[in-house]
Amino acid sequence: IIGGSSKYFKFKENIFHKLYEEILFLSNKYMINVIPSRRTPLAFIERLKKMDLKNIYIFEDQFNPVEYGNLLSEAEVQIVTWDSISMISEAISSGAKTLIFPFEENSCPKRYKNFYDRIIEENFISIYNRNLQAPTPDLNKYNSELKSKILNKIESNLSFKLNES
């Protein structure tokens, strides 16, 4: 999943060059689904199309949530540029191994770094590596813990409300 320029990240040409190199490298061994975001420059997508590689599928309909969801759910591994917490969260929620592709580290906001540190610590993701080594997230455990927290919060608010009356 490839993002694009934002308030924090400029996505300069050297970043796209690195992405091309990695896509080319991985396509020699794996089928690659390239999912650009609405912020991904058209020139990058067009350049990928011109490469005409047999193991690359470029998802072009960003307004088709069904196909987007299918691509996420069918993949064994997700590689996501780290410029969007939402894209990373969607990749993790697919249950596949997720790797984030860092760049422009100096312009990365502290809250983003805190998010990355937390999800790495929780074994949800790894930093991109060519071996595609990453943990498989245990979403059942996470969802169970989240459910307990939500129910406890609701319960504590209910008892507070009942005591007020």
Protein language model regions, located:
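Short, catalytically relevant binding-site loops at active-site mouths
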Residues: 6-7, 38-42, 62-66, 85-87
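Short, well-ordered alpha-helix to beta-strand connector turns
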Residues: 29-30, 75, 95
